[in-house]
Design a protein with these regions (language model features):
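An amphipathic alpha-helix signature
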Residues: 10, 77, 81, 85, ...
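Short secondary-structure transition hinges
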Residues: 86-127, 153
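Helix-turn-helix
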Residues: 8, 12, 16-50, 54
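Amphipathic alpha-helical packing segments from all-alpha helical-bundle domains
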Residues: 64, 108-142, 169
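Hydrophobic alpha-helical connector segments
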Residues: 54, 68-93, 144
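N-terminal intrinsically disordered/low-complexity leader segments
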Residues: 1-4
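Hydrophobic alpha-helical segments that form the core
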Residues: 135-159, 164-174
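Short, basic, alpha-helical segments at the C-terminal edge of helix-turn-helix-like DNA-binding modules
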Residues: 57-62
Length: 177
């Protein structure tokens, strides 16, 4: 299926923001790489900030669609395992998006959408820890989310899948009862 110019701009911006960073990527470069005029970028997105917002929103829509099946699991142990598997699965499917997010980690736009996405995952995890009888399910959820964040960063910056998988299996074993 042919991409619209608007979609091409988004895809190109994502790649360049992931490679060079948001601040180091002028809209003129996005236009050149996408094969469109810079004016067309502003016609569709008005500003570079709005373009970034659109790239982040589109990325989280894709991530949400891809991860839905992982967090509807009723078995609490399987849910925890699914959440632990998310960094591997989602980074492999959306490497550029997560590379961009890694660069934008301190930006409000990135934090806002990441919190919105992770909130529902955290609610599901808290329910899983309650089902398993943990004394402090909220804290267990925070700890697990910190582990997931660390796994995400590790896999994003180090593509040694074997080492990553060993760590992942070790963490999963700690949650099996």
């Amino acid at each position: 299926m042919l991409k619209t110019k608007k979609e091409l701009i988004l895809e190109t911006a994502l790649t360049l923001f992931a490679d060079k960073g948001y601040d180091a990527t002028p809209t003129s470069l996005i236009a050149k790489e996408a094969g469109v005029s810079e004016g067309l970028i502003f016609k569709h997105y008005v500003s570079k900030d709005n373009l970034l917002e659109a790239v982040v929103k589109a990325g989280y829509r894709r991530i949400t669609d891809r991860s839905k099946g992982l967090v509807v699991e009723e078995d609490p142990i399987k849910l925890i395992e699914n959440v632990l598997d998310m960094p591997l699965k989602l980074v492999e499917e959306e490497r550029n998006f997560w590379r961009m997010q890694f660069r934008l980690v301190d930006e409000e736009i990135s934090q806002k959408h990441h919190m919105r996405y992770s909130h529902s995952v955290m609610q599901k995890l808290e329910g899983a820890f309650k089902k398993l009888g943990y004394e402090e399910p909220e804290l267990e959820t925070e700890i697990l989310m910190l582990l997931v964040e660390g796994l995400w960063r590790l896999y994003l910056t180090n593509e040694d899948k074997g080492h990553f998988t060993k760590m992942l299996d070790l963490i999963k074993a700690k949650y099996k009862r």
